[in-house]
């Protein structure tokens, strides 16, 4: 049957999504129209992925009752994915938390006690005692926080400021460490600045799309609908999809490539070799704008230093590199021939050549997209660097319709985790804690004593787990994530660390997640439009929303929790005498006074809020807290290539892409005529680097940390499905989404199932060297692994897939490889 462009788009973007949830979209529309007069509408960005779709939120009698795509939103143009259509229902799960819960026994806190409702005063009393004891006995390195790419911008900023400036601890890291850290380090190594240079407008102008380890059809369906539209509008447009298994994005692919896990590094170097051998290097661009460097190799796998793989590594964790000539680089990639690449990857030669030709053709505008397949990789930084190489060799970058683009999975992994600087090594606007000048800039702007911010990099996500188990990290606050389910290797470090009597764990969450139920204190959290917020999406678009309803019961926003808790500490209790001597006027003041009630933050009066505008935090404090924090934070980037617009501009717009200079947003960075930081006559300028040149890195293939063997004979790759988001803590509480995909399954090749006497629907035990999970065999459906590999989603709290995964990380980014470990199957 011939499928028209119109019917294909409709089927993929609307009908299929609605059918998956068992709901008629026209029925939803009729219900909304029928109540329109009684519903109040306001804009907000979607709560889910990093695409940053705009939605219109309908509220009635203090509840969110409807949601629709915002037709004025440039990202999604009125279209939602199936999760977006059900946004209202994520707010109202039957088990929504509405008051603090503390483990208690005989009337007081006990590690093995039962969760008991307490007041916020009681909750903060216990937290205060635990924090002060740890700080007094062990110092700032004994406390830590694990935050989120789902924090609003000012929540992340407040958390980073409280920990790094207030408690003097860099032991704060976001869950974006698990998803975007490799992209960050890749950007910084190649360009000296974080985040993509292009934008979503590239889609309508591209001639070819290459997906590296990205199932956009399910993980970024709105962007996929735009790619689909472009592909079906022009027969000359091509789509290539690379993955370790077939998935829904392959349905549109002209060239669907399944490769052996880890061998994407080989393919990337082969394409670079092909470009050079076919004289496709853009010599003018290359000569003017590119440097070449050879990176250190044999850098280990981010495991504990005692692990045999770390002991065997020659350069564990090394980020070193040295200059090299073009001839040396040419010789380096020449090793990656077509024959060798086909042999190492398992990809047919004709498919490899077709892929390379897309990049080599000077008349093809190519966009490379990637997500977790690249980033959750023990050489994820290298993979990012190597794809940049292809665009830098050909000059296909920083222009409409072509460029490398790292997609994000969380709504503010860019705007909060990265730009704000909530990583353990970062400060706002790409500054880092190890740079004395950067620390000085922050300390002066925050008006705190010189030397307040520690120079030592704090514990990253996996290191926090290890420090908890080792008894070195004793008070741990987890906000806006479900890391007990989402993080790697649950059994060996995280669970023992959380339940260690030496440690006190706080989890702030709207629901009783696996993490919350593993903690000692649960704090009920306001979510989405129950607070005023701001997110930054994958294309550098910053979007604001207003508080539209009140949170249920005693639930409070993460911002409220951070700011109110800061009142519990006086400077003398957290800062040494040497610091206080520099600023004696700060003696006797609380951290709230010196961090959040300063003239810079508190200068915006409540009169700037409309009379009927909800804003619980600001009205309680007596000033416009969110505006004060945002303007203080935005100062760091203005004039330095990270320019954010004035606060009020965002409430009047559907988002703006930074740098925003003189009221104009930037679509394409680093190119003349598009970027205000590139002067006339410069052509291109990668101004994150001192000489304005980007870097091509020579980096080889290196094997995975763990591969199948005779005992554990299958690769395991983990990930998501369309209907659920991450650990399912929100989407599984939406009945329609839960019905559409009620439990996790093991996607397996039919021949692998047959060889193990397994049939579709059978219960199966999946085991690794670290743990086991009971799941269900699936030999059909959307994901079709090759022989030798199984795929499991991690949304199901009843099947903790991360009991299986290895906590190997990229040694440079410290990001976990969730895509490669060895497992075996046994029929139950």
Curated annotation (Swiss-Prot):
It catalyses: 2 Fe(II)-[cytochrome] + nitrate + 2 H(+) = 2 Fe(III)-[cytochrome] + nitrite + H2O. Substrate binds at residue 794. Its EC number is 1.9.6.1. It is found in: Periplasm. GO terms for cellular component: membrane; nitrate reductase complex; periplasmic space. Its cofactor is [4Fe-4S] cluster; Mo-bis(molybdopterin guanine dinucleotide). Residues 39-95 form the 4Fe-4S Mo/W bis-MGD-type domain. The keyword Electron transport applies. GO terms for molecular function: 4 iron, 4 sulfur cluster binding; electron transfer activity; iron ion binding; molybdenum ion binding; molybdopterin cofactor binding; nitrate reductase (cytochrome) activity. Residues 1-31 form the signal peptide. Binds 1 [4Fe-4S] cluster. Binds 1 molybdenum-bis(molybdopterin guanine dinucleotide) (Mo-bis-MGD) cofactor per subunit. Keywords: 4Fe-4S, Electron transport, Iron, Iron-sulfur, Metal-binding, Molybdenum, Nitrate assimilation, Oxidoreductase, Periplasm, Signal, Transport. [4Fe-4S] cluster binds at residues 46, 49, 53, 81. InterPro entries: Asp_de-COase-like_dom_sf, CT_Nitrate-R-NapA-like, MoPterin_dinucl-bd_dom, Mopterin_OxRdtase, Mopterin_OxRdtase_4Fe-4S_dom, MopterinOxRdtase_cofactor_BS, Periplasm_NO3_reductase_lsu, Prok_molybdopt-oxidoreductase. Pfam families: Molybdop_Fe4S4, Molybdopterin, Molydop_binding. Belongs to the prokaryotic molybdopterin-containing oxidoreductase family. NasA/NapA/NarB subfamily. Component of the periplasmic nitrate reductase NapAB complex composed of NapA and NapB. HAMAP family: Nitrate_reduct_NapA (MF_01630). NCBIfam families: NAPA (TIGR01706), PRK13532.1 (NF010055), TAT_signal_seq (TIGR01409). Catalytic subunit of the periplasmic nitrate reductase complex NapAB. Receives electrons from NapB and catalyzes the reduction of nitrate to nitrite. This is Periplasmic nitrate reductase.
